[in-house]
Regions:
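An N-terminal, globular interaction/scaffold subdomain
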Residues: 2-122
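Short, solvent-exposed aromatic-acidic interface loops
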Residues: 317-321
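Internal, hydrophobic cores of structured domains that mediate oligomerization or house catalytic pockets
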Residues: 66-190, 315
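Short, surface-exposed coil-to-beta transition loops
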Residues: 295-302
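Long, positively charged binding patches that form subdomain-scale interaction surfaces
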Residues: 170-294
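Short acidic-glycine loop/turn motifs at beta-strand connectors
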Residues: 306-309
Length: 321
């Protein structure tokens, strides 16, 4: 139901009265925090936050995340409407415009990573990522999807369009495969925990052996429709596996996947020196995908094998939206 207040706020936006809208956002959020707590307050004020993040000049929009309004007024990294407010902002302005304005470190980092996903090269002039995640997409990160599919496409008055990336996307190019006996599960692998954190709606296992043995641990049948893909074509769905609710953005997925790849490669650097090791891992990795007949609308069935260390990780999950 559209209320008088909605019409009033829309009229203020149409007139470019953004300071008044920011004040309304802050007052509404602070009052809701006092009345009901942080989470309900964030949900209540998110539509107005989306409007400001999408349409206001960047000098004002970044103030959604500033603490100068007082307790309860600040949008956090989890505040979202159709998607995180910081991601809405990041899709609207270049890093050159936003870098001098953004202060909070968590928001700043996620906005920078979003701009990287959208094709910006921040490897010169931007502060290094605290975990050493590169500020320029590797060729294998960019190859498997169009720029428009990497981040939600937000709409001015709320809502967003997003690509639903799944593995396998179809049966095309796959064939009948008889999986071998499943390998023995290995526990305590940091890479396994990192992959589980990436896709917390899926099951993750690690085995010593090739990718099909890892797949056999989670596949519902020893006879599957499956095949191999280059990692560049697997990468987009792995990034999007982390974006399962509106409070998370594609930057979360890229950061989580890089953590997993660093662990799989056995790299230890946090200053970007591990990129060569990750690139080498990606070049040698064998990725086996398989189809499950009961797959939900969102599904991920892939096994990632590193032949250099003889380990393989399977990630398998399915859910309806």
């Amino acid at each position: 139901m559209i209320t008088y207040e909605d019409h009033r706020l829309r009229a203020l936006a149409d007139d470019g009265r953004w300071p008044e809208l920011l004040t309304a956002y802050r007052q509404g959020r602070a009052a809701a925090v006092e009345r009901a707590g942080e989470e309900p307050a964030a949900a209540l004020t998110a539509p107005l936050g989306h409007l400001i993040a999408y349409s206001a000049p960047p000098e004002l929009a970044v103030r959604l995340f500033d603490r100068d309004g007082g307790p309860g007024t600040v949008a956090g990294v989890a505040d979202h409407d159709a998607g995180p407010l910081w991601e809405v902002l990041a899709t609207r302005h270049s890093w050159l415009r936003l870098a001098p304005l953004l202060v909070p470190a968590p928001v700043r980092r996620l906005v920078a990573q979003t701009r990287v996903l959208l094709g910006e090269d921040l490897s010169y002039g931007a502060e290094p990522d605290p975990e050493g995640v590169p500020l320029l997409l590797a060729p294998w990160e960019a190859a498997g999807w169009d720029e428009g599919a990497r981040v939600r496409q937000y709409l001015p008055c709320g809502g967003a369009r997003s690509a639903l990336l799944t593995l396998p996307a179809s049966r095309e190019g796959l064939g009948d495969v008889t999986l071998p006996a499943s390998g023995v599960r290995l526990g305590g692998q940091r890479a396994t925990r990192a992959l589980a954190a990436l896709a917390d709606w899926a099951e993750v296992v690690c085995v010593r052996g090739p990718a099909p043995q890892a797949a056999a641990q989670l596949a519902r049948s020893s006879r599957v429709t499956g095949g191999y893909l280059p990692f560049a074509l697997v990468y987009p769905a792995l990034v999007q596996a982390a974006v399962v609710d509106r409070g998370r953005g594609s930057a979360h997925g890229r950061l989580a996947l890089w953590r997993a790849l660093v662990e799989m490669a056995g790299a230890k650097g946090t200053d970007g020196s591990d990129r060569a090791e990750v690139d080498a891992l990606v070049a040698r990795m064998r990725c086996f995908i398989w189809h499950e007949p009961t797959a939900g609308l969102r599904h991920l069935h892939v096994a990632l094998e590193d032949p250099a260390c003889g380990l393989a990780w399977a990630v398998s999950g399915s859910e309806d939206l």
